Amino acid sequence: MQLQDLVVTVSLLAAFNGGVEAWSPTNSYVPANVTCPNDINLLRNATGLSQSEIDWLKKRDVNTREALESFLKRVTSNFTSNSSASNLIDQLFSTNSSNIPKIGIAASGGGYRAMLSGAGMVSAMDNRTDGANEHGLGGLLQAATYLAGLSGGNWLTTTLSWNNWTSVQDIVDSQDNDSAIWDISHSIVSPGGINIFKTGSRWDHISDAVEDKQKAGFNVSLADVWGRALSYQFFPTLYRGGVAYLWSDLRESDVFKNAEMPMPISVADGRYPGTAVIDLNSTVFEYSPFELGSWDPSLSAFTDVQYLGTKVSDGKPAEEGKCIAGFDNVGFLMGTSSTLFNQFLLRINDTSIPKFIRNLATHFLKDLSEDYDDIAVYAPNPFRDADYVNNNRSKSLSESEYLFLVDGGEDGQNVPLVPLIQQERDLDIVFALDNSADTEENWPDGASLMHTYRRQFGFQGQGVTFPSVPGTDTFVNLGLNKKPTFFGCDARNMTDLEYIPPLIVYIPNSRHSYNGNTSTFKLSYSEKERLGVIRNGFEAATMNNLTADSNFAGCIGCAIMRRKQQALNLTLPKECETCFTNYCWNGTIDNTPAKGVTASNDFDNASGSAAADMAEQDASGAASASSSSRKKNAAVSVDVNAKTLFAIITAMTAVFQLI
């Protein structure tokens, strides 16, 4: 389709046939013992990229080179100083491959709203989308090296990546199929609609799968249930929603092995029961097809995702030559990044639902949280006895028997930027797709960027840099939350930082042809609603199909080349100067209190002393890397049966629909 016209032209989505042969060793949701090398060590220090990622990048760089050069030439072809643009592109794509810009894309959380609106934004960058080259940014996705997702954004990135790198175009064109991806016409609690037998059977299967894992001796929580339920919507052609499908299986998919797609990265936060996480102290975990871990000084380690569930000490299996495989179920890891249960508990007082329902929901969800059931349990802890934690930091993460992970946006960083701004990944530009519901009307207000910027001044942000951004009042008052905005346009203003961070292209969800500001907890969408939100996302990412600014695609090209152009002291086309005037935040501040936005806490007035205060607050090393020894070693498990699960999800859904 042209997403703005919704024209069906593409063949139906093929079944997954990308050469995957791994799957769970039990062909079920239950992990199992497998043999592994006697000298294997599953842990490494976070001092650089893994060798697996380095080797994969060599192949990806070959593919992105041609795609990016083609994209840049196309979007700058209408520059009056075309020769200047061509010369710059030729210089960047000379024999020295280190001069070629590297791109990352980050899709925010926000439930199905973020998944669908983010899908529209990503489709605008995909040359497989009809009309994306003419009316959008087609080819940009093919030129990207990384694609990060969090919560609802993670549902998007996982759907595309683990369905043989399918396209949003294909998904939309296949909506009439019996086994259509993203068929969310019925709530996750009642997938059969009026067909109660289908609903009952679905929940029996979910209950059986999770109960079997529990009987095998593995801890389970509602994250297992949540992930299993979601999987049916994202992998409908696979047996029971991919009950045996693994995160590490992507390594064996031809489209990934050949680096024909960006590397997907998902994000979650570390949290122990009884603690809270904020932007300054959270331990941000990332998981790629190769590894799970964190760059943060509270852990500074990565482990092989394929052998999660193995009992280890400093990365060495407790039993020589024996590991666990099958723990990394794709639904479980996908559900880990989107544990909406505790997200609702944290934000319920900010909702407008009736007080008596709020009190009931708070009581119900508080009981869940106190029982630790809202947390994804990774046990045994893959980082047990890890020796890479900063000496000035609590070692709770490595001393605990269990690793607890929650929704990646719980620390306020709802756009998963942390993995993409690491110096080791050396990106020049990151596209931040923000579909958060920050304001009272469920639009973004830049809070996520504010939190990521602020984090660099705390202990956990050591060694990470991020360009200056304003607070939420300024975002709203200047309208920065209603159109694409560039941050960090001039590297000369950041020479005092440890390294020059990527330029950030902020693309917020905003109203164009459809009200895409649905509630995070809206659990069902009609086909009309799905297509409306996707279409609006396409328009938000393209300045309304380039009708609001016919030069917008060229400006994106300028932004992509900016870091390398400055580093190499090359001549910039004059059109790029105009672009930067129009789209770069120029430092203007407007602290007038804006209605219904995330509190900035006088963020716009922050100075060096404020940053020092932030660092001081973080020095205690509390929150995600601390708790009482009783809580951090508490066994966590849910008594699983179909009736209990159905009752829990039904009650949650009834409340969510009132938000």
Curated annotation (Swiss-Prot):
Residues of this chain annotated as glycosylated in UniProt: 33, 45, 78, 82, 96, 127, 164, 177, 219, 281, 349, 392, 493, 517, 545, 569, 605
Keyword Hydrolase: yes
Reactions accelerated catalytically: a 1-acyl-sn-glycero-3-phosphocholine + H2O = sn-glycerol 3-phosphocholine + a fatty acid + H(+)
Name of one Pfam family that matches: PLA2_B
GO CC annotation terms, alphabetical: cytosol; endoplasmic reticulum; extracellular region; fungal-type cell wall; periplasmic space; plasma membrane
Group of enzyme by EC: hydrolase
Gene3D superfamilies per UniProt: Cytosolic phospholipase A2 catalytic domain
GO biological process, one term: phosphatidylcholine acyl-chain remodeling
Keyword tags: Glycoprotein, Hydrolase, Lipid degradation, Lipid metabolism, Secreted, Signal
Main location as per UniProt: secreted
GO molecular function, one term: phospholipase A2 activity
Protein's job: Catalyzes the release of fatty acids from lysophospholipids. Phospholipase B may well contribute to pathogenicity by abetting the fungus in damaging and traversing host cell membranes, processes which likely increase the rapidity of disseminated infection.
Family to which this protein belongs: Belongs to the lysophospholipase family.
Protein name per Swiss-Prot or TrEMBL: Lysophospholipase 1
Organism: Candida glabrata (strain ATCC 2001 / BCRC 20586 / JCM 3761 / NBRC 0622 / NRRL Y-65 / CBS 138)
